[in-house]
């Protein structure tokens, strides 16, 4: 084995020289130079500085402007709440541990940080799935008389939390476990060992299938069909400038959504799957640290893509920040997204 396994940790470093110490008790500077830990701390500080204001502002602006309280925006607000869970429950902890060079909060703190980081990330992921399904139903009309209402939005929000809990909670009750990963400053699900005592192998397989492969397949299917539907509508109405604009907007939105999802999560999932599939293989601590920390940046990408791109929300946000006046003079009502309309138009397929 090229790593060192303890009762509550796995360090990707052989203890042949006797230098390995518990990541809950000693700085892990034998894994990486101190400046690398400082760099991680600086990165987490940046995510907090950017992630908290934009997600909090999303909630505040929606409370201030009743016109934003549409059913679909419930899902978007839920996305902001999930990102705040990641920022407050995970990022702040990781910032402090990175500054110290080891996980100073002990095993209990590791489970706390791992749970909230996983919960927030999974709620955000399943929000994207709900948004994809909503866009597919509204635009592609597999159910011609369907209208996305408040009850559907509430059901969608509840669904995201249920699915997230089915991923984040099992390690708390003995199915798998949370351990420090990479440079031992943040905690996540144990991809490093089989750990039969907690049936770790079955949980990791379950997590990859149910909480990664299936959501990815749903997102690709829904937005793939959406693009095809808009293209078909554009082909039938060559002279319709509105439809042509709708095609461009929805295509741009889909590309940004899919690419951002892949950029954030595929590197982390791929590295985790490689480590799990090659038990005992030789890999450095930075190998897992970089994709794990990069995946955390989704707390910034999500509100930018799903909130800031919405013209109505952007105008309301500017109005709020400018104490009730919009210096751009845009008409919020005219530019708002109305996802309930039945025609394939810009207002229907624009980012909600």
Swiss-Prot record:
Topology of this chain in the membrane = Multi-pass membrane protein
Q: Where are the annotated glycans?
A: 2, 15
Report what the Swiss-Prot or TrEMBL entry states about this protein's PTMs.
Contains one covalently linked retinal chromophore. Upon light absorption, the covalently bound 11-cis-retinal is converted to all-trans-retinal. After hydrolysis of the Schiff base and release of the covalently bound all-trans-retinal, active rhodopsin is regenerated by binding of a fresh molecule of 11-cis-retinal.
Question: Which segments sit on the Cytoplasmic face?
Answer: 62-73, 134-152, 225-252, 309-352
Can you name a GO cellular component term? plasma membrane
Query: What are the N6-(retinylidene)lysine sites (modified residues) in this protein?
Result: 296
- Where does this polypeptide localize? Membrane; Cell projection, Cilium, Photoreceptor outer segment
Region annotation Disordered: where it falls in the sequence: 332-352
Q: Which tissues show it?
A: Expressed in rod-shaped photoreceptor cells in the retina that mediate vision in dim ligh (at protein level).
Q: Where is this site: Plays an important role in the conformation switch to the active conformation?
A: 113
UniProt biased composition (Low complexity): 335-352
Q: Single GO molecular-function term?
A: 11-cis retinal binding
- Name the domain of life: Eukaryota
Main localisation, per the record? membrane
Residues in the signal sequence: none
User: What does this gene product do?
Assistant: Photoreceptor required for image-forming vision at low light intensity. Required for photoreceptor cell viability after birth. Light-induced isomerization of 11-cis to all-trans retinal triggers a conformational change that activates signaling via G-proteins. Subsequent receptor phosphorylation mediates displacement of the bound G-protein alpha subunit by arrestin and terminates signaling.
Protein name (record): Rhodopsin
Native organism: Alligator mississippiensis (American alligator)
User: Lineage of this protein's species?
Assistant: Eukaryota, Metazoa, Chordata, Craniata, Vertebrata
Instruction: Give me the gene this protein comes from.
Output: RHO
